[in-house]
Amino acid sequence: MSTIAQHGTAEHKMPREHFLNAAYTVKSWFLTMDHKRVGLLYLFSICFFFLIGGTFASLIRLELATPEADLMEADQYNVAFSMHGIVMIFFFLIPSIPAVFGNFIMPLMIGAKDVAFPKLNLTSWYLFIFGGSFGVLTTLLGGVDTGWTFYTPFSSTYSNSNVILAGMAAFIAGFSSILTGSVSYTHLRAHET
């Protein structure tokens, strides 16, 4: 029977302040530089947009329950169908994995204490919210009926005037995803010993 000798054991000290015991004020959440909190901010906002897209999907399914146009007219159905696609693609599907898991889990997996550019990381979330507010404003102003792809004949000739606003919302959300993806994790990777 052998025994294992423990040499140089160091006690692990928890940091004084981290995302679990830091102040829980609104200011501390909206001005945070902690990558875990930014990941949670992305999670909460993406869940909000998922609920909006799910509401449009429920309206579509309720309309398709019977052959008659019970709930919406044809134009309103096209708007609900398009807004469901726009919200679910640009504000749920594209940012969900890189923004939430990339901010919360990736730095922990590679051993980094934080992301390389924490202010840029928080700025990307603010841009995502800014683009999402354009998407919600598009919905409140009547939506678009072009589909989520914004094909040219539908978006130029046969559409209402909200296509530019919806396109700006998608562009700003896409730019936010570029900023989220450009946050470099490898510069702060833990060194191998």
Enumerate the language-model features and the residues they cover.
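Extramembrane terminal tails and long inter-domain/linker segments of multi-pass membrane proteins
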Residues: 1-36, 68-72, 152
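Hydrophobic cores of alpha-helical transmembrane segments in multi-pass integral membrane proteins
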Residues: 39-112, 116-150, 162-185
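Conserved small/polar residues in nucleotide/adenosyl-binding loops
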Residues: 186-193
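Helix-boundary and loop/linker segments of multi-pass membrane transporters
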Residues: 30-32, 80-81, 158-160
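Compositionally biased, intrinsically disordered low-complexity segments enriched
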Residues: 8-9, 37, 86, 193
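Hydrophobic, small-residue-rich membrane helices and short re-entrant helix-turn-helix hairpins
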Residues: 27-40, 111-114, 189
